Amino acid sequence: MKYLNLVFVLQLLISIKYASFGRAFSLFEDDTTFANLDKQLKLPQNTQQTLKLDRLNHDDPLFTTFISSVDTDYSLRLRTVDPSKLGIDTVKQWSGYMDYKDSKHFFYWFFESRNDPANDPIILWLNGGPGCSSFTGLLFELGPSSIGADMKPIHNPYSWNNNASMIFLEQPLGVGFSYGDEKVSSTKLAGKDAYIFLELFFEAFPHLRSNDFHIAGESYAGHYIPQIAHEIVVKNPERTFNLTSVMIGNGITDPLIQADYYEPMACGKGGYHPVLSSEECEKMSKAAGRCRRLNKLCYASKSSLPCIVATAYCDSALLEPYINTGLNVYDIRGPCEDNSTDGMCYTGLRYVDQYMNFPEVQETLGSDVHNYSGCDNDVFTGFLFTGDGSKPFQQYIAELLNHNIPVLIYAGDKDYICNWLGNHAWSNELEWINKRRYQRRMLRPWVSKETGEELGQVKNYGPFTFLRIYDAGHMVPYDQPEASLEMVNSWISGNRAFSDLSTLENAS
């Protein structure tokens, strides 16, 4: 997740053509509705700049094109990636684009499982932002290799494709190698595009339709994944592919509840010592109540404006005090690394950007775009000005559970921005058919079957599981690769309660 740079956010909001912005912020003092705010605030007409691209010829003869059987305006380009050229992995790989006419082009990279690709599950991985590339997951967290300082791949023995085939999709439009003339600035629109991609993918790989299929991601994927799963449940009731579960790591899914847990996390109630003074903690605690009122107005409104205001206030009041400490918003244990990419705090992400901009890498993958960036500010700004970040998506998690589709909410317990306290809280308050039974379950130790070490805490009832992972920040696979792999292997094997098999029935 690319956290909101507070100066950047405030500059954007000040650019709104409104004579007295303070008049809008006076609403924070009471529970006044936003009945007249639509007339008072005027959003810029163009909140997302047109992409400036250096494009290659996408009529590349190395691509095979599959035309959608449902809508011929959509197609999927597919090419084999020679594993020996890049050395990311030795397994079979494909890359390409989903195209919509000449206006939208979504890039993906697909890796077969290292184990049994004909029968192993398939996982779609999504990073967050909004506006950040899923190649962060591929080349920095959980993929077959990471990129070293010498720009060479480093084999990852804990890759999630050890026992699953992995799809890394660059979405929404404008992220990474994806491009187009249209603008996508809401989770709802992004979800529709991702769903169509999945339909086309399984048309191109029909032998995989019966395999278990999981959607996984982190951070802002806590928005994306519920929306995509909702699209599948609503539009694909006969399941032309087999949606088996979803997994969300350190996600932002229910902003109203999660915002209440910044102060506890910063002030010593999340298992780590306080990083703010008692005075700052008291001030933040008071601000949380005001943030909650604004988020309630956002949830109740059909307009984006209350959500934009909620985002601006809550981030200023609840993120800025923490950011001023100099600590990493993704890992409360220390500051950002030196020489890291802008706003992302990790030097290794700079290596990924450099690697993906090598002409030989782009040529091997068949990219239509020469300029790669791990996070796109235009996409981020577009989502900001729809208020998307403050909108709720937990209702679609309830929909999945009520359809008996398993959901895993996992969280590294040293993250601040999407911390484990907030994720535990919203999952506990989720309205679904077995809410009360789930609430009665207590967190219990999650113990490694490999080492016998306690890796975290787990809570489960039926299809719903919450997992706290010790000593991991925002990106669990990066901080705890062994635990991350054990987690995903257990989950996709059907052990939803993360229990010893002898006690699994009682635990679930």
Swiss-Prot record:
Residue positions with a glycan: N163, N242, N339, N371
- State where substrate binds: C418, M475
Q: Does the keyword Glycoprotein apply?
A: yes
What is the active site of this protein?
S219, D415, H474
Which Pfam families does the annotation name?
Answer: Peptidase_S10
- Region forming the signal peptide: 1-24
Q: This protein is called what?
A: Vacuolar serine-type carboxypeptidase ATG42
